[in-house]
């Protein structure tokens, strides 16, 4: 009872945390970033895959720097924006900077010598203007406008080189600066993934010479008829289809449980709840992404429902694998001491890490805690490795030729393959596929999850066809018969 109360309190706290952060999560394409007293040299503002006629609207409503007006910083081009064009979202950029401007003549992809095309927007505080400089053929004719508009069509129609803007106004209001520009991808050659940075190049980070900045910037990314990045456009349909698949699987599993209701155990109902919550999570996610694509902003109610569903789904899925691996309800009814310790440590960590992953995924790239995303991913992998321990212990505790040992080994391979495909292969696929096909990583993850659910349902279906349940019972009965027989023979011999 105490454990149930603690679990309920823990889940209530996590749901409260989700509701608090739901409003700050900004997985949308009309969004903004506000940083204060930040001394990072490069602040990532966004990454987006643009198709032809796509636009990126940048509205800097407030910028200030913590140096005196007479400082040399106001006579140098130390601050500004940098727009990079890359092949795909997963490209790692090597920032090779110079001491003078923080912007080198060439910025390279990690591990390559290919110079990336870029546009720099350097602030000139003396002239109150922004100097626009282009580097690379891919952005040579990129249309940049200073006209305020909806982000869809308020751009010049003439794309001749001589009409390309080279300066933009920089508004000064008592030391607080503001600016606006609109980037328009007019041709097929300009399609691709773009990354936007803010540059703070006044002295090395953390030194006396460095300057902290306050920055508020609003961004609107838009493709024709859609606010989603090119690789995200098919995602709503993908998750609607996944919803139908998981719902069908849940109905099928419910029918199996009803048919063999005399042999059903509690773990079977937990498995059903996992599939149901997976279906709900896919549905809420699909609706949320659909509204983002249509309106540019997520509907808060669908976002919160998605966070709650994915939290319950992840927690129940994790617990299910732990219980199946330990054999609870099948080959034993009580956890061992080391299994209790493992459960008490890993499950809360996994729940908190799931929350962290959701918050990081929904946060702005430029927010400080976004940089901790890799730690959350590593913790997730650690938790999945940890849940293999009960499986290994169960395998070692079985007889060499027992059917249960064979089934444990199969389950072990299933989990290893699932973790490898959804944590490693999905990551590699997302960071290596062309920007139009980034949705393939989501497809692979959903297919892998669906296959695992089917295999788990088949392997651990209710008796009398479940070897996992059937064999240990026979083994226990045999042992009991041997004990009774030996005891009876011994008693008879002693009486004689």
Annotate each language-model stretch with its function.
Residues 4-233:
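Soluble extramembrane domains flanking the early transmembrane region of eukaryotic membrane proteins
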Residues 27, 42, 74, 78, ...:
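Sequence-level detector for tyrosine residue identity
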Residues 58, 194-198, 254, 325, ...:
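Structural signal for hydrophobic/aromatic residues that build the beta-strand cores
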Residues 63, 201, 259, 330, ...:
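Residue-level marker of positions within ordered structural domains that often coincide
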Residues 209-351:
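Hydrophobic alpha-helical transmembrane segments corresponding to the first two to three helices
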Residues 297-496:
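Generic detector of multi-pass transmembrane helix bundles and their immediately adjacent loops
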């Amino acid at each position: 009872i105490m454990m149930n109360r603690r679990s309920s309190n823990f889940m209530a706290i996590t749901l409260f945390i989700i509701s608090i952060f739901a409003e700050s999560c900004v997985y949308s394409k009309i969004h903004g970033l506000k940083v204060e007293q930040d001394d990072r040299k490069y602040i990532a503002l966004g990454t987006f895959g643009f198709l032809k006629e796509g636009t990126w609207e940048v509205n800097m409503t407030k910028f200030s720097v913590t140096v005196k007006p007479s400082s040399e910083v106001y006579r140098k081009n130390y601050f500004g924006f940098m727009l990079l064009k890359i092949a795909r979202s997963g490209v790692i950029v090597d920032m090779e900077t110079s001491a003078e401007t923080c912007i080198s003549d060439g910025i390279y992809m990690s591990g390559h010598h290919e110079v990336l095309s870029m546009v720099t927007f350097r602030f000139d505080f003396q002239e109150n203007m922004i100097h626009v400089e282009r580097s690379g053929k891919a952005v040579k004719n990129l249309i940049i406008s200073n006209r305020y508009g909806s982000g869809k069509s308020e751009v010049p129609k003439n794309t001749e080189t001589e009409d390309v803007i080279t300066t933009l106004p920089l508004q000064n209001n008592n030391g607080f600066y503001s600016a606006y520009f609109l980037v328009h991808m007019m041709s097929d050659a300009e399609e691709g993934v773009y990354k936007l940075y803010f540059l703070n190049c006044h002295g090395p980070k953390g030194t006396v010479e460095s300057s902290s900045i306050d920055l508020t910037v609003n961004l609107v990314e838009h493709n024709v008829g859609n606010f989603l990045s090119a690789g995200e456009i098919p995602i709503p349909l993908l998750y609607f289809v996944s919803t139908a698949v998981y719902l069908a699987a849940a109905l099928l599993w419910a029918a199996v449980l009803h048919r063999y209701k005399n042999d059903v155990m509690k773990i079977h109902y937990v498995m059903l709840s996992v599939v149901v919550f997976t279906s709900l999570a896919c549905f809420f996610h699909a609706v949320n992404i659909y509204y983002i694509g249509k309106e540019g902003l997520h509907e808060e109610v669908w976002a919160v429902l998605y966070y709650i569903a994915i939290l319950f789904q992840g927690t129940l899925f994790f617990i299910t694998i732990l219980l199946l691996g330990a054999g609870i309800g099948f080959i034993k009814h009580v956890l061992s001491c080391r299994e209790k310790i493992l459960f008490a440590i890993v499950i809360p960590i996994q729940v908190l890490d799931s929350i962290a992953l959701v918050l990081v995924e929904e946060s702005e790239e430029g927010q400080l805690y976004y940089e901790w995303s890799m730690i959350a991913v590593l913790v997730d992998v650690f938790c999945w490795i940890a849940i293999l321990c009960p499986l290994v212990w169960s395998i070692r505790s079985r007889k060499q030729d027992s059917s249960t040992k064979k089934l444990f080994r199969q389950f072990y391979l299933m989990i290893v393959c699932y973790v490898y495909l959804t944590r490693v292969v999905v990551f590699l696929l997302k960071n290596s596929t062309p920007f139009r096909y980034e949705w393939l990583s989501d497809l692979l993850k959903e297919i892998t999850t669906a296959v695992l659910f089917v295999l788990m349902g088949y392997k651990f279906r209710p008796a009398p066809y479940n070897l996992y349940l059937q064999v240990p019972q026979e083994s226990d009965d045999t042992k009991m018969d041997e004990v009774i027989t030996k005891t009876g023979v011994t008693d008879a011999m002693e009486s004689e």
